[in-house]
Regions:
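Glycan-recognition and catalytic cores of secretory/periplasmic carbohydrate-active enzymes
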Residues: 1-507
Length: 507
């Protein structure tokens, strides 16, 4: 991980964020940012925080981010993040949300939470099926022109602001803020961006309110245009990433609606795309098709672990374990090594591929490592799961050492492999116990995405809770007061009944 950080820092664009390449395009490096946040969390490496904060700010303020409707575009065609390829992908937005929420968690800066909420609102409004599952993408073109849906002439822009009741001074100031000119910056029209951060623009509370009015009016006007085509396929692996992102946002930002969104999508995948022991890859027009790949099993399985952390419903852990066992059965090679990507049902392949490169999404093997090691730390099949994860790491050892920048998600999982995380168990007779609620609230808001914690109160399904190794012998009765256990490798300290003392010990 240190070598990866060093190499990323060598190519870091300290002025515009992101990482320089030989080509003109810049892609969102969200997985690299997640690795940097983990490294900063553990070692306080200030280079990591610099790369994260500079890049997130530059991307959010650039044309690559939809300043009116929210959501991140596929990539920028310039190094300033100004001119995007206007296609929007579910996975890009999921990873971006994760990076924003994690940045908020480690820095406490409220703007990251605001930006994450804005991106989630785009997903809720435009990318969520009535069933609760998430669509795959939105095209770049409408009416045969790339970006036509998103760009503005100065004339139309000012017309909308005037109709919204904004005075001349406010209109001119908003024009400057979003860098709108008569000449434009994209084929005579304007891609909106924020060249100067809001905090440096001299924006007071009144201007922020006027900006919100303008944004709402522009979004309403834009809704009259012909939208780009939406790809309404429901893909299991990509939904897994968004479920993980929303679960993280729900618990860290204390937004139950985000957790509900994640829960609805997870239930859809489980009930409609998992049947007779097979996870399917795609759902569209009422039909599931194609046996799932390693990426489908590992990313959806991992999302159930993230959903458990947000809901504390042990059913999600049980389901994650079931998927992990199916994954091992379907994709583990005969000899120790990395898992196959293609399902055994795909008979037309002469050789089953093995993939470790973390491209636009984490590789199936990277996500499989996280699923296996997290379940092992929860106490399930610990020796077997750790051994399998170690075999995957061994297979990619040379690639990780030679080119760690191509494997940021896999590098991130080295923390799970070589560092034994602390484990936490909180129990109470009632979910309304004030000490219990305070303990749970701290764990959800402050713990990183790899934290191992369980909780149980006497009002939940105790049969399911009894299946959690960390709760063995600790199932509460109605009369019991709250207790917090701090453990390592399943060995626990004396239970702590006071929430404030518990928070001091774990902070």
């Amino acid at each position: 991980t240190l070598k990866a950080v060093d190499l990323f820092y060598q190519s870091f664009d300290g002025y515009r964020g992101g990482f320089l390449t030989n080509g003109p395009n810049k892609f969102p490096p969200s997985m690299a940012l997640l690795l940097m946040i983990r490294q900063y969390d553990r070692n306080q490496d200030k280079r990591c925080l610099e790369m994260v904060e500079t890049t997130l700010s530059a991307m959010k303020r650039g044309g690559i981010y939809d300043q009116i409707g929210g959501g991140l575009c596929r990539y920028a065609t310039d190094h300033d993040w100004l001119v995007p390829h206007f296609e929007k992908m579910l996975y890009d937005n999921a990873l971006f949300i994760m990076a924003l929420v994690e940045a908020h968690r480690v820095t406490g800066r409220e703007e990251y939470a605001i930006w994450a909420r804005d991106c989630i609102e785009y997903i809720r409004r435009d990318m969520t099926d009535p069933s609760g599952a998430f669509y795959s993408a939105e095209d770049a073109d409408s009416d045969g022109e790339e970006g036509k849906f998103y760009v503005w002439s100065e004339k139309e822009f000012l017309e909308v602001l005037e109709e919204a009741g904004l005075n001349l001074e406010d209109r001119k100031r908003i024009l400057r803020f979003w860098a709108v000119t008569q000449r434009g910056n994209f084929e005579g029209s304007n891609i909106l961006s924020e060249p100067v951060p809001l905090s440096e623009f001299g924006a007071d509370e009144r201007f922020v309110q006027k900006l919100a009015i303008a944004r709402k009016a522009l979004l309403s006007r834009r809704a009259r245009r012909n939208r780009p085509l939406r790809d309404d396929k429901v893909l299991t692996s990509w939904n897994g990433l968004m479920i993980s992102a929303l679960s993280l946002a729900g618990r860290v930002l204390q937004e139950p609606e985000y957790t509900n969104m994640a829960s609805r999508a997870a239930e859809f995948i489980w009930s409609r795309l998992y049947a007779e022991g097979t996870l399917y890859r795609r759902f569209r027009d009422g039909e599931r098709r194609y046996a799932g790949t390693l990426s489908d099993y590992s990313l959806f399985g991992g999302s159930l672990l993230d959903l458990y952390r947000a809901t504390l419903d042990p059913q999600h852990l049980m389901r994650a374990r079931e998927l992990a066992d199916k994954m091992v059965s379907n994709f583990k090679p005969e000899n120790p090594g990395a898992f196959y990507e293609s399902p055994p049902e795909q008979k037309e392949l002469l050789v089953r591929p093995v993939e470790g490169y973390d491209g636009v999404i984490p590789s199936g093997n990277s996500a499989a490592i996280r699923l296996l090691l997290t379940l092992a730390h929860y106490g399930y099949e610990a020796a077997d799961y750790v051994r399998l994860a170690r075999h995957i790491f061994s297979h990619f050892k040379g690639a990780l050492f030679e080119y760690p920048q191509a494997h940021p998600y896999m590098c991130m999982n080295l923390f799970l492999m070589h560092g034994i995380p602390r484990e936490f168990a909180v129990t109470a007779g009632s979910k309304d116990d004030p000490q219990y609620k305070k303990m749970i609230g701290h764990m959800m808001e402050r713990m990183d995405p790899d934290a191992i914690y369980v909780a149980c109160h006497a009002d939940m399904d105790l049969n399911l809770a009894a299946g959690l190794p960390l709760l063995e012998g600790r199932i509460p009765e109605k009369k019991d007061t709250a207790l917090a256990y701090i453990c390592k490798d399943m060995a626990c300290q004396k239970p702590e009944p006071d929430a404030e003392e518990f928070i001091k010990k774990v902070s």
